[in-house]
């Protein structure tokens, strides 16, 4: 994703970390985060919050989250990395793109498990709310504070404050012309659209067709990626502020109906919210190109398909073949549709090679993790996965503070390495604290609230059969919540 892609070249580079540079996400650093990644990442955002023990069948996901988060940090920490190492890495791979792609595969794999096991749309959205928003609001607040004291800057994608506030309400700033604050939250826009699609597909009982959706979005990235407009609505229709307001109202109303009503109205509400999200993703992206956005959805549904294969709902031969095909489509979309701009032929070749390696290695990493899912992992690695959402959202602010306090560009190689190691230690300590005192307590609040809502209004579960063993799904659900 060019977003994860940092930069106008749509790839993130060391400079992507600069607040004023339009680079990729992280840009999730590469316009690509999370987790929640899932975690994001969220599971849905880059990090997951349910601890899966080091020997648990879900521990491998925590290990992958931690690895993905560190790749994103490396991408934004580029100006602190010894130039010799940094330059060689970017000749072959964009760490930000790679990390975010891994996060999106994880989100696709783990998030549907929670929704399908419990069968409750209301519980799913309450879980998402308390899983993602508390730390998200903290990260936005910290970024604003640093901007006010002239330590951090804004990227400038969204020049209108009201539009930025409205777009941040639904974590959809990257498809509503809002400011991505902090810069890595661009990836949460695509996580949110994925959740909306999952909800609508689940309520329509067509959610098991994951392979078809993965192939469809992958093919759309190749066929339509160079045709669909970028930021069409905000540039050609009403003002960005009005579009963001209308989108917020329609999506929130649709979700309220889907969560609070019964029968056909709730299905219509879910479908309406999903249609708005998908339309914005395809036509109104302000940082990623349409081919990048569609490739992201293809990767997430590929993760879902692999989850179904692991649960016996697809044959492994079929799942692997389709996964390879989707990765090939995502690679083809990037090579075919990216805009070379002022790049020389050699620079264009390096970009294409980096894009290929980022997508390919993300898929390979996920495949290796899935293959060794029953291995017992070191506790430190699984802990990095648990705090990965904090690492993803908070590392840009810590980098700004670190850069303000110290500069290492002229130090010797080993002194610079020691300073970098100190930064990582501080980052892990801070993110461990936010996980223990912000993320985990608020997740508990969400679980208690969901139970109270069930007691007050009755369960809203859909009778959707799941073939996977109950114990396995229980683990998956806890990891996604």
Give the residues covered by each predicted segment.
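Solvent-exposed interhelical
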Residues: 192-238, 250-271, 307-320
């Amino acid at each position: 994703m060019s977003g994860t892609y940092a930069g106008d070249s749509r790839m993130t580079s060391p400079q992507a970390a600069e607040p004023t540079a339009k680079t990729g996400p992280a840009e999730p650093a590469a316009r690509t985060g999370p987790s929640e990644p899932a975690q994001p990442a969220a599971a849905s955002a880059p990090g997951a919050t349910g601890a899966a023990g080091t020997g648990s069948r879900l521990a491998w996901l925590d290990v992958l989250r931690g690895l993905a988060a560190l790749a994103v940090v490396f991408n934004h920490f580029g100006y602190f990395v010894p130039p010799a190492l940094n330059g060689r890495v970017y000749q072959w791979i964009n760490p930000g793109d790679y990390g975010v792609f891994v996060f999106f595969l994880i989100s696709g794999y783990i998030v549907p498990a929670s929704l399908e096991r419990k069968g409750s749309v209301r519980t799913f959205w309450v879980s998402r709310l308390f899983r993602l928003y508390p730390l998200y609001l903290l990260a936005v607040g910290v970024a604003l504070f640093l901007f006010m004291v002239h330590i951090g800057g804004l990227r400038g994608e969204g020049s209108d404050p009201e539009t930025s506030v409205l777009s941040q309400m639904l974590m959809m700033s990257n498809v509503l012309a809002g400011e991505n604050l902090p810069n890595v939250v661009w990836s949460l826009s695509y996580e949110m659209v994925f959740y909306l699609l999952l909800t609508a597909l689940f309520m329509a009982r067509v959610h098991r067709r994951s392979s078809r959706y993965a192939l469809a979005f992958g093919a759309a990235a190749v066929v339509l990626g160079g045709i669909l407009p970028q930021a069409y609505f905000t540039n050609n229709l009403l003002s960005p502020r009005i579009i963001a307001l209308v989108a917020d109202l329609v999506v929130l109303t649709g979700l309220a109906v889907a969560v609070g009503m019964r029968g056909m109205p709730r299905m219509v509400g879910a479908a309406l919210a999903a249609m708005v999200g998908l339309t914005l993703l395809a036509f109104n992206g302000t940082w990623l190109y349409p081919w990048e956005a569609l490739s992201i959805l293809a990767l997430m549904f590929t993760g879902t398909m692999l989850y179904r294969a692991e649960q016996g709902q697809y044959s492994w031969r079929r799942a692997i073949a389709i996964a390879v095909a989707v990765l090939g489509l995502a690679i083809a979309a990037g090579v075919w549709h990216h805009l070379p701009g002022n790049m020389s032929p050699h620079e264009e070749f390096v970009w294409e090679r980096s894009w290929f390696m980022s997508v390919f290695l993300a898929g390979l990493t996920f495949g290796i993790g899935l293959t060794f899912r029953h291995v017992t992992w070191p506790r430190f690695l699984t802990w990095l996965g648990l705090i990965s959402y904090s690492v993803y959202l908070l590392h840009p602010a810590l980098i700004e503070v670190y850069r303000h306090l110290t500069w290492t560009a002229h130090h010797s190689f080993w002194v610079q390495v020691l300073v970098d190691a100190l930064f990582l230690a501080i980052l892990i300590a801070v993110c461990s604290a936010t996980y223990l005192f912000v993320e985990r307590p608020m997740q508990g609040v969400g679980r208690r609230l969901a139970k109270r809502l069930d007691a007050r209004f009755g369960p809203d579960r859909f009778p959707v059969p799941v073939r996977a063993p109950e114990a396995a799904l229980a683990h998956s659900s806890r990891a996604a919540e």
